Swiss-Prot record:
<feature type="topological domain" description="Cytoplasmic">
    <location>
        <begin position="491"/>
        <end position="505"/>
    </location>
</feature>
<keyword id="KW-1133">Transmembrane helix</keyword>
<keyword id="KW-0539">Nucleus</keyword>
<keyword id="KW-0488">Methylation</keyword>
<dbReference type="GO" id="GO:0005794">
    <property type="term" value="C:Golgi apparatus"/>
</dbReference>
<dbReference type="GO" id="GO:0008381">
    <property type="term" value="F:mechanosensitive monoatomic ion channel activity"/>
</dbReference>
<feature type="topological domain" description="Lumenal">
    <location>
        <begin position="1"/>
        <end position="209"/>
    </location>
</feature>
<feature type="modified residue" description="Phosphothreonine">
    <location>
        <position position="105"/>
    </location>
</feature>
<dbReference type="GO" id="GO:0035579">
    <property type="term" value="C:specific granule membrane"/>
</dbReference>
<dbReference type="GO" id="GO:0005789">
    <property type="term" value="C:endoplasmic reticulum membrane"/>
</dbReference>
<protein>
    <recommendedName>
        <fullName>Transmembrane channel-like protein 6</fullName>
    </recommendedName>
</protein>
<feature type="topological domain" description="Lumenal">
    <location>
        <begin position="271"/>
        <end position="338"/>
    </location>
</feature>
<feature type="transmembrane region" description="Helical">
    <location>
        <begin position="250"/>
        <end position="270"/>
    </location>
</feature>
<feature type="topological domain" description="Lumenal">
    <location>
        <begin position="453"/>
        <end position="469"/>
    </location>
</feature>
<feature type="topological domain" description="Lumenal">
    <location>
        <begin position="527"/>
        <end position="553"/>
    </location>
</feature>
<comment type="subunit">
    <text>(Microbial infection) Interacts with human papillomavirus 16/HPV16 protein E5; the interaction alleviates TMC6-mediated transcription factors inhibition.</text>
</comment>
<dbReference type="InterPro" id="IPR012496">
    <property type="entry name" value="TMC_dom"/>
</dbReference>
């Protein structure tokens, strides 16, 4: 792969050339020079071949000669042509640019039909010969050109004018000046009658309305961008701590959007109708003591927060005679709001929409992060193209400087990592240490799962656990302490293994913490659906599971606050005051991300038993963001080994989709299809399984009349038929596969384009060397011709004297 050319031409100039840009005549001379060179090359092919062969022999004999010649050895004509190339003259002549766009606006105005905006060629320096500027003997002054351009811009439509101003290779100040001048029309409106060049009242009114709507749209767009949550905070975090820490907060923002979507569906179709038609309470409302905020029991039990509060009857129509003696049946001719069916369908549809959104987000993130295979040239792009010239405020410019500096640190650290390989002995020693540490971490995860199982069995067999409400917090507290302490133990063990890449270190820590969380959650799922269902026969076990998940979620938040207080704040104070060190703790990305995934998994597990649990998760995420942001800025330092987190968002979404969401979906499917609901509470109290609510609804529809006879057919052939489920799953997998193939194809195309750019660079070097060789041959021919002419013009007397001598 050839590197892009980067050199500076030292072109000899005459005193009259200084301070002047290239004129159309100079450009014409350049074109004529290239045409003459091509003709000379076609006429002297044989001589050129001999010269190339001789040059190849010289190159073979000398090992110090390279392909590209230094510019100090180029001839004056070659350097002048190189300096006049289009790539070297971009933006050199402002007057020529204005003339170019003036002629373009004239052509646009003279057309009968308005062209498409996509047909404009946004070339920075097109050939001025196309506009017949060299035929004008007296060039217009820059101010006259600008005034003509303003007049022509005023005659264009607003969209065309903005598009053309956007494409001009001028500075932002000049573009603003042209836009302000073109917004005040002083001539005759195009296509509008008028006398003496004065616009009519309708034209002025229409122009004012267009400007007002345009300004209103820009203001609304700026307001929407300003209303984006945590916009400035995320920029500040990314500038000070890099993309690795920023990926955690972006992932938290994504989880907030998922929970908001889930809560919207549950409120609209489950909690809203139930609040509108509240059931009768079984007894007097219990008194709230304040402990309910931690336990979720007490006065929260008989509310819309839990499964047991929802009725198993219709909500918007009086009942006729029961169909089976226990189920409320609507009268003939009506289609009531069936609460059991609405409860089950809403949970299923919300999970399906979450799955589609999650898969789409993961595929989009995968395409954005893995589309480009290599990062060659990214350093130059970051240096030359990262600055946003629209930034005018001092605080924003300082923040952008921090972002660019951190980005360069990450890129250089990644480049240095690729150029420092390990030896064979070092790799073997690293593999042995990795194996030992992995065994210890797996043993720790297995021990935590066994401890949770033993303690949960003890809680089931303990008689005082059912009588005291505070005892219900013991199991969540034990699980939370294990989730908090085990990652620290794994982090201590990870200090023994020498990781070259900080990215690999984070990925390994994420895998170990994920195994720990999965082991604990698997044990808890068996505890809830395998043990608690049998122990709580005759009671509302769904409410207990919902309260248990609420307690786990609240306890996880409390322990997170304590960990932030003692793990970051206290450690910083001790390090600075007692140990006299300036080192602050680093932000543990792996542990904090797995805490977010763990909390979101608890939310998905509890949606069926506590529909209001996503609201609790939203409040928790909001508090976590502000607590973590404050602690990060005050107590943490940037990573000592900067690294580029280009794929972290994709990895986080993948972990959220497959282990977390898929596990929660399997848990809920087992509860819907296999577990018998409680007979004393909830919308499915009279059914053997929750899934039978659909069949009961079909029987009600058949009794409701012929107007809705097609709905039982839809349920029978689309909902109960497993072929439809497999078909939808196959289509989803096919879409994912096609998206992956499209991304791979785009990567191949990008690689081919990069290779083509590299080949074009080599072609330029080859053509410049050929040009130099042609000029060298031409200079030698001129010198030999001059020598022959001098010999022929010598006096005959001198020749006679030489012969006599």
């Amino acid at each position: 792969m050839a590197q892009p050319l980067a050199f500076i031409l030292d072109v000899p100039e005459t005193p009259g050339d200084q301070g002047q840009g290239p004129s159309p005549y100079d450009e014409s001379e350049v074109h004529d020079s290239f045409q003459q060179l091509i003709q000379e090359q076609s006429q002297c092919t044989a001589q050129e071949g001999l010269e190339l062969q001789q040059r190849e022999r010289e190159v073979t004999g000398s090992s110090q000669q390279t392909l590209w010649r230094p510019e100090g050895t180029q001839s004056t004509a070659t350097l002048r042509i190189l300096a006049s190339m289009p790539s070297r003259t971009i933006g050199r002549s402002r007057g020529a640019i204005i003339s170019q766009y003036y002629n373009r606006t004239v052509q646009l105005r003279c057309r009968s039909s308005r062209p498409l905006l996509g047909n404009f060629v946004r070339s920075a320096w097109p050939s001025l010969r196309l506009y017949d500027l060299e035929l004008d003997p007296t060039a217009l002054e820059e101010e006259e050109k600008q005034s003509l351009l303003v007049k022509e811009l005023q005659s264009l439509a607003v969209a065309q004018r903005d598009h053309m101003l956007r494409g001009m290779p001028l500075s932002l100040a000049e573009k603003r000046s042209l836009r302000e001048k073109s917004r005040t029309p002083r001539g005759k409106w195009r296509g509008q009658p008028g006398s003496g060049g004065v616009c009519s009242c309708c034209g002025r009114l229409r122009y004012a309305c267009v400007l007002a709507l345009h300004s209103l749209g820009l203001a609304l767009l700026s307001a929407l961008q300003a209303l984006m949550p945590w916009r400035y905070a995320l920029k500040r975090i990314g500038g000070q701590f890099g993309s690795s820490v920023l990926s955690y907060f972006l992932f938290l923002k994504t989880l907030l959007a998922f929970n908001a979507l889930l809560l919207l569906l549950l409120v609209a179709f489950i909690m809203g109708p139930q609040v509108a038609f509240p059931p009768a309470l079984p007894g007097p409302a219990p008194v709230c003591t304040g402990l309910e905020l931690l336990t979720g029991a007490g006065c929260f039990t008989h509310t819309v927060m839990y499964y047991g509060h929802y009725s198993n009857a219709t909500l918007n129509q009086p009942c006729g005679s029961p169909l089976d003696g226990s189920q409320c049946t609507p009268r003939v001719g009506g289609l009531p709001y069936n609460m059991p069916l609405a409860y089950l369908s809403t949970v299923g549809v919300s999970f399906f929409i979450t799955c589609i959104t999650l898969v789409y987000s993961m595929a989009h993130s995968f395409g954005e992060s893995y589309r480009v295979g290599s990062t060659s040239g990214i350093h130059a792009i970051t240096v030359f193209c990262s600055w946003d010239y629209k930034v005018t405020q001092k605080r924003a410019s300082r923040l952008q400087q921090d972002n660019i500096r951190t980005r360069l640190k990450e890129l250089l650290a990644e480049w240095q990592l690729r150029h420092s390989p390990r030896s064979v002995c070092g790799r073997l020693r690293q593999a042995a240490v990795l194996g030992l540490v992995w065994l210890l971490c797996l043993g720790t995860a297995l021990g935590c799962a066994v401890a949770v199982h033993v303690f949960s069995e003890f809680m089931i067999q303990s008689p005082e656990a059912a009588g005291q409400e505070a005892v219900l917090l013991v199991l969540p507290l034990v699980v939370g302490l294990l989730n908090l302490g085990a990652p620290y133990l794994c982090r201590v063990l990870a200090a023994l293994e020498p990781h070259d890449s900080p990215v690999l270190e984070v990925y390994v820590a994420i895998c170990r913490n994920l195994i720990l969380k999965l082991a604990i959650l698997g044990t808890l799922c068996y505890h809830w659906l395998g043990r608690r269902v049998g122990v709580l026969q005759g009671q509302c076990w769904e409410d207990f599971v919902g309260q248990e998940l609420y307690r786990f979620l609240v306890m996880d938040f409390v322990l997170m606050l304590l960990d932030t207080l003692f793990g970051e704040l206290v450690w910083r104070i001790i390090s600075e005051k007692k140990l006299k060190r300036r080192r602050k703790p680093e932000f543990d990305i792996a542990r904090n991300v797995l805490e977010l995934i763990y909390g979101q998994t608890l939310t998905w597990l509890g949606v069926l038993f506590s529909p209001l649990l996503p609201a609790v998760q939203i409040i928790k995420l909001l508090l976590v963001f502000y607590v973590k942001k404050t602690s990060l800025l005050a107590n943490c330092q940037a990573p000592r080994r900067p690294w580029l987190a280009s794929h972290m968002s994709t990895v986080f979404l993948t972990l959220l989709c497959f282990p977390a969401f898929l596990g929660a979906a399997v848990f809920l499917c087992y509860a819907v299809w296999q577990v018998k609901p409680s007979s004393t509470c909830g919308p499915f109290r009279t059914l053997d399984t929750m899934y039978e609510a659909g069949r009961v609804w079909v029987r009600h529809l058949e009794a409701a009349g012929p107007r809705v006879s097609w709905l039982p057919w839809v349920h029978r052939y689309l909902m109960e038929n497993t072929f439809f489920v497999f078909l939808v799953s196959a289509l989803l997998l096919a879409v994912i596969y096609l998206n992956i193939q499209v991304v791979r194809g785009q990567r191949k195309v990008i690689c081919l384009l990069k290779e083509q750019i590299s080949n074009e660079g080599e072609d330029k070097i080859f053509l410049i060397n050929k040009l130099h060789s042609i000029y060298e041959r031409k200079e030698r021919e001129e010198r030999s011709r001059v020598g022959t002419t001098e010999e022929a013009a010598a006096p005959p007397a001198l020749l006679t004297d030489e012969q006599d001598a």
